[in-house]
Amino acid sequence: MTQAQTAAAQPDAIPVAAPSPQRWRVADVVALFELPFNDLIFRAQQVHREHFDANAVQLSTLLSIKTGGCEEDCGYCSQSAHHDTGLKAEKLMDVDAVLDAARAAKANGASRFCMGAAWRNPKERHMPALTEMVRGVKALGLETCMTLGMLEDEQAKQLADAGLDYYNHNLDTSPEFYGQVISTRTYQDRLDTLDRVRDAGINVCCGGIIGMGESRRERAGLISQLANLNPYPESVPINNLVAIEGTPLAGTAPLDPFEFVRTIAVARITMPKAVVRLSAGREQLDDGLQALCFLAGANSMFYGDQLLTTSNPQTQKDRALFERLGIRASEADAMSADA
């Protein structure tokens, strides 16, 4: 039986991959979520293999270059000045210290280096150091990404001129659930920043956080928003809430881990050429669940012992898992989707 015949024989006539162009209605995304688990994972793996090497995963390292004291009130975040989490606010790191961390990340096998700053938006006085960081990290042969909050047009242009590969600015959740998590920044603020990043010629890294108490339909609403961006993001990080003491979401019940795997699969189907990244909260998944995430179409993960202010599986454990699964680390330039 050919691959086409195999696909045609599967139950539930929902497209394996979105024809282009297609608007993903929330109801369509909900229908994907509600497929039997095996059917959903099978379809996601089909899509994944159409565009990527199914046994290659990109390793990314994330560094907090400016920690704590953020003006925003994001209910999940330990770095918000609105929450009493015991985290001490720090100034922007020196460029040399950032480059030292990037060298260590590369030596550990990472091909992508992400730099995150806890503030509402960068000030003009920060831009020279930020652009120097980008140039320095690129000179090491690493793919670069920054997440700095909202940007103005000129700031996006400066980062683009420095050679920034990706800018991360997450939508976090669906428009309907958003107001229950954040009040200091609107959904439209986030969309406007993504437009500025696109207009500057920088690749978009945009995803969200699940397990914040949202419904399945609201999770589908997030995926619908992401998939309907024009174009959808090149990089889609999916975070599993880490309920941090002192934040408003500290008492949130953990998400069913199979729902997390479903979310990875639905992201893969609706955004077939995106790099789908396992992000915060991976430490909460055992090896079997992480293997299911790779089967569902995840092909990147944050690698290293720390993600901003939350812990992450140790690098030795990740290497051992890769060896057991026959997965290899992929170079950044090898992660472009096949046409």
UniProtKB/Swiss-Prot annotation:
Cofactor mode of binding and number, as noted: Binds 1 [4Fe-4S] cluster. The cluster is coordinated with 3 cysteines and an exchangeable S-adenosyl-L-methionine. Binds 1 [2Fe-2S] cluster. The cluster is coordinated with 3 cysteines and 1 arginine.
EC assignment: 2.8.1.6
Domain Radical SAM core: 55-282
Positions contributing to [4Fe-4S] cluster binding: 70, 74, 77
Gene3D superfamilies named in the record: Aldolase class I
Pathway named in the protein's UniProt entry: Cofactor biosynthesis; biotin biosynthesis; biotin from 7,8-diaminononanoate: step 2/2
Entries under InterPro entries matching the protein: Aldolase_TIM, BATS_dom, Biotin_synth/BioAB, Biotin_synthase, Elp3/MiaA/NifB-like_rSAM, rSAM
Keywords attached to this entry: 2Fe-2S, 4Fe-4S, Biotin biosynthesis, Iron, Iron-sulfur, Metal-binding, S-adenosyl-L-methionine, Transferase
Enzyme class: transferase
Reaction equation(s) it catalyzes: (4R,5S)-dethiobiotin + (sulfur carrier)-SH + 2 reduced [2Fe-2S]-[ferredoxin] + 2 S-adenosyl-L-methionine = (sulfur carrier)-H + biotin + 2 5'-deoxyadenosine + 2 L-methionine + 2 oxidized [2Fe-2S]-[ferredoxin]
One BP term from GO: biotin biosynthetic process
Cofactor annotation: [4Fe-4S] cluster; [2Fe-2S] cluster
Molecular function as annotated in GO: 2 iron, 2 sulfur cluster binding; 4 iron, 4 sulfur cluster binding; biotin synthase activity; iron ion binding
Binding site for [2Fe-2S] cluster: 114, 145, 205, 277
A Pfam family per the record: Radical_SAM
Keyword Nucleotide-binding: no
NCBIfam families linked: bioB (TIGR00433)
Record's function text: Catalyzes the conversion of dethiobiotin (DTB) to biotin by the insertion of a sulfur atom into dethiobiotin via a radical-based mechanism.
UniProt record similarity statement: Belongs to the radical SAM superfamily. Biotin synthase family.
Subunit structure: Homodimer.
HAMAP family linked to this entry: BioB
Record protein name field: Biotin synthase
Native organism: Burkholderia multivorans (strain ATCC 17616 / 249)
